Amino acid sequence: MRILLANPRGFCAGVDRAISIVERALAIYGAPIYVRHEVVHNRFVVNDLRERGAVFIEEISEVPDGAILIFSAHGVSQAVRAEAKARHLTMLFDATCPLVTKVHMEVARASRRGTEAILIGHAGHPEVEGTMGQYSNPQGGMYLVESPQDVWQLQVKDEQNLCFMTQTTLSVDDTSEVIDALRARFPAIVGPRKDDICYATTNRQEAVRSLAVQADVVLVVGSKNSSNSNRLAELARRAGRAAYLIDSASDIDDAWLSGVGCVGVTAGASAPDVLVREVIDRLQALGGAAAQEIQGREENIVFEVPRELRIEVQQAD
């Protein structure tokens, strides 16, 4: 059985930065460090940080006075940010992915102008909640759509003063269909100058398409609440391949590999490489050959952590 690895796969720059912020805060200030929402959507990462002293909460009211608080990579609404700043916290660090912040700024600009804004995204996802929460102009409006059907049912105040933006972790193909519907329904609508779906999401989706051409079965390492990981599994299935979203090697069912000549492995942007290595080990124990990595896009983007954490770590060293 051949084992093919998607390239790129796993951690993106935003996830690397978010995890590093929590790790550095723990190293400098010690436990507990409070984090609003799971810093990234991966069970292994969250459990590891929890064991090291991170406390994951959903409400700012759960954070005691004098504590250190970190916002997750998914971002928060202006209301949550204001609530946190009103508290007597020792330090407040923002681990919001800079590419999510870009979308936040687009929404905030629309709000200031009074332009109605339409967000393409998944209802209930923390990134969507944070992005929707950047709009505060009662004279305008902020709307959420997930499908072309939502677009055709949407009613706005002024069809001549509209813009749209997207969640960063969506399916590129699905989003394109929604954008086409928006442009057909509202010809005057204005989109972002640069796509909001992030480079890592796009690259990993391209890689899984290439993987699905060669593999009989695709394993996606990622947690069930990871939007980008779910999209990878969906893409593989649309390509006609059996695809399974797994948290770890222990989730692999031997029956999935019965009669399989080639298995493809990829990982969502919040899944650490250690989990991929464990999956490879399991596949090789089941008769797999040495893993081969397919060609793909090189990624060299790095997002810096907040200056306070860089300075303090340097001083500690």
From Swiss-Prot:
HAMAP family: IspH. [4Fe-4S] cluster binds at C12, C97, C198. Its cofactor is [4Fe-4S] cluster. The active site is at E127 (proton donor). Its EC number is 1.17.7.4. Belongs to the IspH family. Catalyzes the conversion of 1-hydroxy-2-methyl-2-(E)-butenyl 4-diphosphate (HMBPP) into a mixture of isopentenyl diphosphate (IPP) and dimethylallyl diphosphate (DMAPP). Acts in the terminal step of the DOXP/MEP pathway for isoprenoid precursor biosynthesis. The lineage of its organism: Bacteria, Pseudomonadati, Pseudomonadota, Gammaproteobacteria, Enterobacterales. This is 4-hydroxy-3-methylbut-2-enyl diphosphate reductase. It catalyses: isopentenyl diphosphate + 2 oxidized [2Fe-2S]-[ferredoxin] + H2O = (2E)-4-hydroxy-3-methylbut-2-enyl diphosphate + 2 reduced [2Fe-2S]-[ferredoxin] + 2 H(+); dimethylallyl diphosphate + 2 oxidized [2Fe-2S]-[ferredoxin] + H2O = (2E)-4-hydroxy-3-methylbut-2-enyl diphosphate + 2 reduced [2Fe-2S]-[ferredoxin] + 2 H(+). Homodimer. InterPro entries: LytB/IspH (IPR003451). GO terms for biological process: dimethylallyl diphosphate biosynthetic process; isopentenyl diphosphate biosynthetic process, methylerythritol 4-phosphate pathway; terpenoid biosynthetic process. Coiled coil: none annotated. Isopentenyl diphosphate binds at H41, H74, H125, S226, S227, N228, S270. It holds the Pfam family LYTB. It comes from the Bacteria. Pathway: Isoprenoid biosynthesis; dimethylallyl diphosphate biosynthesis; dimethylallyl diphosphate from (2E)-4-hydroxy-3-methylbutenyl diphosphate: step 1/1; Isoprenoid biosynthesis; isopentenyl diphosphate biosynthesis via DXP pathway; isopentenyl diphosphate from 1-deoxy-D-xylulose 5-phosphate: step 6/6. Dimethylallyl diphosphate binds at H41, H74, H125, S226, S227, N228, S270. Keywords: 4Fe-4S, Iron, Iron-sulfur, Isoprene biosynthesis, Metal-binding, Oxidoreductase. One of its GO terms (molecular function) is metal ion binding. Binds 1 [4Fe-4S] cluster per subunit.
